Amino acid sequence: MAKKLRVGILFGGRSGEHEVSLLSAASVLNAIDRSKFDVTPIGITKQGQWLAAADASNLLEGDQSAVARRLRAGDPDTTPGAKLLHDGIPTLFPPEPPPAPHAKAGIQLAPAASETRLDGQSTRLDGKSLDVLFPVLHGTFGEDGTIQGLFELAGIAYVGSGVLGSSAGMDKDVMKRLFANARLPIVRHVTLLRADWEKSPRKSIAQIEAALKYPVFVKPANLGSSVGISKAHNRKELGPALTLASRYDRKLVIEAGVGGKKRKARELEVAVLGNDSPQASVVGEIIPGKEFYDYEAKYLSEGSIPVIPAKLTKAQTKQVREMAVAAFKACDLSGLARVDFLMEPDGKHRIFLNEVNTMPGFTQISMYPKLWQATGVPYKDLITRLIELALERHAEKTRTTYTRDE
């Protein structure tokens, strides 16, 4: 019998999408092929503490009260600082070190035990050796390149895009610049800093109104799952929308609306899978139950209707799938991404690239697994393929020389 690969599933995190991550991770943990993988759940609280074993399970189930009580009591069996161990990595302490040298608090990296291999093929967490990490983390400190940088420093194989792709895929402003450079069609937009909005609100609104017509969509540049997004139909609604978005990021993106007064833009989605030769799924469409596909519509409501495959012409389908792969490559992504589009409901039916999501939702109602299911890749096989892609990408990286030969 072949030896099982040891996979660490990370979830939670310091993000406005913490709860979404818990839902996604629960689905992955339920569906992953246990005949091939030995799975270790790894939780990260909203405060950034790392949890393993029963504490990770409590976090996943939403029962953080038990975790919190044990943390406050200093239970020696609790692992809030679940050590991510690997040879050659120095100890990294949180901004405020624990009061005692051996106190368990915050996140800590430390050299691993001597049996840990030096070739970057394995890491250790809380005494367990792991071959690959699957960060089912959405939003800040999970999908934005920060934790990917940690994995890169430790030489650990992991699912999803690298530091560059993850950070570019999280920042809607940078993402749009890359799309424009690749000559991919995007909607008109304005980028505004929170500092400028707070310093000169009138000037900021004038800048937006000079460039765009109402309605507009106001978004935090670095957040997903439609958190903090508002649709503003006029100046009266624009101010509160900017204030809301500024709670979640220092940079805001304001986009022109697509569609007419009576008909909304069509929202199309494509799932992309692969590394250097990515493949696109069938095209899907979301028909929101609300005015637009916001956080509640995505995760809390049953009003939105997914249509798979989307009702498009052959030419439109081909165009959208090709644009999805082009966007994936433009942002230097790997592993997986969901690519979102807006299509004019009338007139020329122009199609605009909206954004990429480097770690799309994996809940039971999420489009990414549904799109691949419709393309012929079952959920369990999809998870297996993502882990294989992570190992392939890691093996490719080991071919790179990082030091100068004397």
Residue ranges and their predicted role:
Residues 26-27, 243, 325:
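Solvent-exposed alpha-helix faces
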Residues 179-180, 208-227, 249-263:
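ATP-grasp fold ATP-binding core
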